[in-house]
Amino acid sequence: MIKEIISQYQNKSFLVAYSGGLDSTVLLYKLLEIKKKYYIKIRAIHINHNLTLLSKKWSEHCKKICNINHIPLIVENINIKNKTNNLEEKLRIKRYNIIYNHLFSDEILLTGHHINDQCETFFLSLKRGSGPTGLSSMSFETLFGTKKIVRPFLKKTKIELQTWAKKKKLHWIEDFSNLNIDYDRNFIRNEVIPILEKRWSYFLKNCFRTTIICQQETRLLNDFLRERIYKLIKFDDSLNIENFKNIKQAMCTALIRYWLLLKKIKMPSYKNIQCIYRQMIFSRIDSNPKIILGKHEVRRYKQSLHFIKTQPSLKNTLLFWHKNNIKLTLPNNLGYLIKNNNGTVLPGPKENELINIRFQYEGYVLILGRSKKRKIKKIWQEKNIPPWLRNQIPLLFYNNYFISAIGVFVVNIKNKNRTKCIISWQNDLKSTTNNFFSFY
């Protein structure tokens, strides 16, 4: 399998995730054998999780093996203070972030995952109630940001790797924390799978076959959905759900899942997807429901679903802008306001007026070009500003006089004895959601 990988990839530069255990040790030595016949570049990376007093000793073992074999080794340390909630997931995320930062653009990350690991992952997904995508578990090749992870041993059992390692008289680390069945993966590995294998000797390979079938069916489903989803995605990346009430629920939820898949986030649970379907499709047309997904939200506005990053409320924020300052930085990464010649023409402040920026206003407003005051909520609606953006737009005040929602509208005030000033709002918000803004 490794020879096939060497011939398949032109760059032939590999970074081995080297724990010092059986799997990664076999992987490292397999590559060394191939290096005798083919030109390849090998580096290794060892992550010390600092979970045991032996951690330092394991790092030294990895250094020794790599020094003997002239393999450049990177050693990094992880220290997690809170070792209670979801420790395995926290370590995995930190580990892969570190590895990604060390991975060269022309390198492929190789890991020693085998059939046993695949079966464990399958059972963990089963425990979570996953569908075909989750039950697909690991694939031979996975996109890793802009790079790749390849798992050459995914068809091999742990016994096969162990047999080869003993034959070659290799030395590897035995991590006895793997026997601690308080961790779900260890429980499956040590308590569940041995019983199943004892009953059915072919269980592991059939479990692996199931993951391959799930992968194939997931690819087919995604191909099917891809053709339909791009007809529903608008230019602002929102999802048009206007006709979802006339489509079967299974198709609707599949389209929602695929749309979220394109956002490159951790896939929401079945429960969350069903919640999005019920609340977004069947709530009142004038309501604006939201579902929170970690640091993001799914919101509905005018028969479209929007995926947005949750922003802290600016309701009580008040910023003072000194008249001598050309630029004012805004909170929440909203960019900055600047006095220049490319923005909105506004009435200037009087000598005794303080310039201040707020993000909340309630009441009636008379905007330029109109003859009657209207509730500001109605103006936001008219300008197609969705609710979650309304308290992110800088509102310009002179003392307590409302002057402008920068870049959206200007308030009609008496201009007597006022000079003119030009202010522009430089930010990513308008460029990514420019369909919501009408500029004067």
From Swiss-Prot:
GO cellular component terms given for this protein: cytoplasm
GO biological process: tRNA modification
UniProt GO MF annotations: ATP binding; tRNA(Ile)-lysidine synthase activity
Chain positions recorded as ATP binding sites: S19, G20, G21, L22, D23, S24
Compartments it resides in: Cytoplasm
Reaction equation(s) it catalyzes: cytidine(34) in tRNA(Ile2) + L-lysine + ATP = lysidine(34) in tRNA(Ile2) + AMP + diphosphate + H(+)
Enzyme Commission code(s) on record: 6.3.4.19
CDD domains referenced in this protein's UniProt entry, alphabetically: TilS_N
Any Pfam family: ATP_bind_3
Keywords: ATP-binding, Cytoplasm, Ligase, Nucleotide-binding, tRNA processing
Function: Ligates lysine onto the cytidine present at position 34 of the AUA codon-specific tRNA(Ile) that contains the anticodon CAU, in an ATP-dependent manner. Cytidine is converted to lysidine, thus changing the amino acid specificity of the tRNA from methionine to isoleucine.
NCBIfam families named among the record's database cross-references: lysidine_TilS_C, lysidine_TilS_N
Domain notes: The N-terminal region contains the highly conserved SGGXDS motif, predicted to be a P-loop motif involved in ATP binding.
Family of this protein: Belongs to the tRNA(Ile)-lysidine synthase family.
Name of the featured protein: tRNA(Ile)-lysidine synthase
Taxonomic source organism: Buchnera aphidicola subsp. Acyrthosiphon pisum (strain APS)
